[in-house]
Amino acid sequence: LKAKIYSSFVYPVSLSDAKLLEDVIIAGFPLGKEVSAAIKISKGSVSSLAGYGDNYSNFQTDAALNQGNSGGPIINKKGNVIGVAVANYGKKEGIESFNFGVKSSTLRAFANSNGIDFEYPNTRELTNSKLGELITEGTVFIECHMTLSKIKKVVNELEKNKKAVYEQFIK
C-alpha cells in the first residue's frame, strides 16, 4: 500500500449511529486515478439501519458508492464520520442505491479494542464550503500495489476464515 499524507487532520467520529433519512456524504477516489487524482464526493441519505442480510453492524445509503470508495468516510453535515464505505451490491443485479457502510458504533468498538483514540465529534452543522475543506484535508488516496493473483489469494484466504475475521472485527 502507498499513500501521500500531507495533513494531520483526523475526522471526528460520531458518538451515535446514522439515523434513518439522515443526509450523508461519501468521500473517496472512485476508479482510483483513472478519472482524476482529485477527491470525489456523492451525497444521499441513510435508507436502512441494517446492512445486507440483516447485518446490524452496517447501514444502507442511497449515496453513490463505487469501486475506490471502499474504506472511505461516510460523514454527516457536522463533518463527523457516521460510517465507513464497504460495499455496493446493486450493480451486479441491476439494482441502484444498494450501498453499505459500517456503523460508527462498530468502528468505535474496533478502535477502542485496539487502543485507537478519536477526536470529539462536532456538535453543529458545517457549511458546504467547510465540509469540502475537511473532506479534502481528511481523505487520502491509498494505492494497492498487489498483483491481481495475490489479491485473489488473499480474498480466498479471507473467505475461508470469514467467520473468525468477522467475529474478531465485531468484538
What are these model-derived regions, one by one?
Residues 13-15, 71, 130:
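A generic local secondary-structure boundary/capping motif
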Residues 1-10, 37-116:
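Active-site region of chymotrypsin-like
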